[in-house]
Amino acid sequence: MTHLFALSELPLDEIHRLLDEAEAFRSGRIWRPAAPMYVANLFFEPSTRTKCSFEMAERKLGLHVIPFDPERSSVQKGETLYDTVRTLEAIGVDAVVIRHHEDAYFEALRHAVGIPIINAGDGCGHHPTQSLLDLLTIRQEFGAFTGLTVAIIGDIRHSRVARSNAEVLTRLGANVLFSGPAEWKDETNPYGTYVEVDEAIARADVVMLLRIQHERHAETMGLTKEEYHARYGLTLERARRMKSGAIILHPAPVNRGVEIASELVEAKASRIFKQMENGVYVRMAVLKRAMEGRMEHGRMAEKWHVVQ
């Protein structure tokens, strides 16, 4: 079964293949299913970019998208995630995309369902498609990863983006720096070195900023937004000390004037909206992989063909 739960489960050659496939879609390659195939997006947390990006990718591939709203589903009556996914499998859905607030929600499904599951974010755990689109954006800029310095700045402890990216970037040969408030350090993450924010920004080829994950905090932040920006944000002054050719990334949503000065969101060095564009192509590649795995596993052999 061709699930995608975490990039840490994929060998580097498969990650490179996904990036190559995404680049091919970006260059205009068109794929279509030879017969109807169905996918459901189960988002148990709010989302704009990931949800809409998956839906765009699904439609570009000619997949049929089954509407699903947790607030108007039997989840509200106590139905479990497992029973929800098994129901969708039973009625003919070929793959599911899931975002869930629970870390590693997918472990209960890994060997229990017969359709591919794509993780669109699990609590503070993993966000594999975000990492893939970040990797694609970095590769487009620098051509390779070996020797690059990537500074991940902000709410490290509560960020699935930080966790996913630090692991895969380290495997790819990049040097990862972390920076942010001491109380938001992630001591369980073995990848990356903690430095002060000014040092991180000055050394980085890639400055990756993170949103404060207020919804995952047990306590309120002890700083005002203005204080956080001054101490840990990418201010205009700090941006002037970035290396020549360095780029700015952010998984979004962006809190302007908090983790990044508003003027920098669309500055020359920013690739924030390029990340969003790349997200569609990356998710097309991931969905294609999932559907091919579905065909090999079950009832739909020889389902895809290339449209030249």
From Swiss-Prot:
Key words of the record: Pyrimidine biosynthesis, Transferase
SUPFAM superfamilies assigned to the protein according to its UniProt record, in alphabetical order: Aspartate/ornithine carbamoyltransferase
Entry protein name: Aspartate carbamoyltransferase catalytic subunit
Entry's EC annotation: 2.1.3.2
Source organism, top-level taxon: Bacteria
Gene that this polypeptide is encoded by: pyrB
Binding site for L-aspartate: K77, R160, R211
Reaction catalysis annotation: carbamoyl phosphate + L-aspartate = N-carbamoyl-L-aspartate + phosphate + H(+)
Residues holding carbamoyl phosphate: R49, T50, R99, H127, Q130, A252, P253
